[in-house]
Amino acid sequence: MKLEILEKINDSDYNEIVDDSKKSTFYTSYKFLEFIKENLKIKPSFIVSYEKSKINGVFPFFIKEGEYGKVINSLPFFGSYGGIISENSKIDKAIITEFNNYNKKNDVLSSVIIDNPFCKNEKIYSQFFNCTDIENRLIQSIILNSNSNEIWNNFEKRTRWSVRKSEKNNVEIIKFEHESEELENFYNLHLESMKKKNGRPKPKKLFSLLTKNFVNDRDYNIFIAKKDGRSISYILVFYYKNFSEYYLPAYDPNYLPLQSTSYLIWKSIQESIKRKIKFYNFGGTWKTQKELYLFKRGWNATDYNYKYFIFKNSELINSIGLEKILEKYQYFYISPIK
């Protein structure tokens, strides 16, 4: 077995192992890594394992250089997760050992592996990654293992009521094609929503990079709800293998009583069923987000637990202060907030 740390990898070589692996998700796809790269202006790095010149394992990660040292995430940027993609525990161990050595030899402030919730690989990281902290996380995902009627009947009554309210109020659902004004309105509604929640908005260039890096109606759809010709809510959904990723919603608060976001979700679930997708992934939910958790549970979403495995320089982080450090490493995870 041969191991290398690369700053560039051939996309066909990467796709060959990732597309065939049960451990890969949308977030570890080559297209999404390119999407992160252009959003963050940082190139990904890879630990690659070879057997007879053929790749049999890969570990993608991003390094943010800063005045306090390197911060490494596999993977950064709004709820992404990464980890090792291989089908052999010996390869996993070898890659983790190489990563441990990299962390030790370099000026690393924090190095984080965000485990894939769907492949249960956490024992490998628990045993072999030299972590100082482990943080528990949760995502919620609908398992699409039956027909549309059965899935509908498994939703809670309040969820079905929300969808029907939009239908009764003649809300129309369309798919985005190429209208730049729709992307502009989508972003403005997202920005307004994040300001009200005191949250961090996604960068505006995400939308131009979306149409550059992905193919509409193949890699993603933007579903748009309209009332009397006016666009009142949006959701962006990505598709990759067995996964639909509910990535970004936005809505006009003046039309909130129409429950159009629920109608959009249902239409996107129906689209996912047509595509024979297995998981409709709502993504992460914080422990403090009880209302959001109950909203997702109303769709009969299943809980999937996963972990952040963190190696960090605790002494340096404590002396500088985590809030001050976070300002310099935007879109990267560094340490639990205590």
Residue ranges and their predicted role:
Residues M1-E7, S12, K90, L326-K338:
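Short, Lys/Arg-enriched, disordered terminal segments
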Residues K2-K52, V58-G69, N116-P257:
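A conserved beta-strand-loop-helix scaffold within acyl/acetyltransferase catalytic domains
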Residues F46, F59, I63, Y125-E150, ...:
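Active-site/acyl-donor-binding loops of N-acyltransferases
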Residues V48-I55, G79, E87-Y102, S208-I320:
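Aromatic (often tryptophan-rich) hydrophobic motifs at membrane interfaces
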Residues E65-Y81:
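Conserved acyl-donor/pantetheine-binding loop and adjacent beta-alpha core of acyl/acetyltransferases
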Residues I84:
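Active-site phosphate/ATP/adenylate-binding loop shared across adenylate-forming ligases
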Residues K90-N136:
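Non-catalytic accessory segments adjacent to catalytic cores
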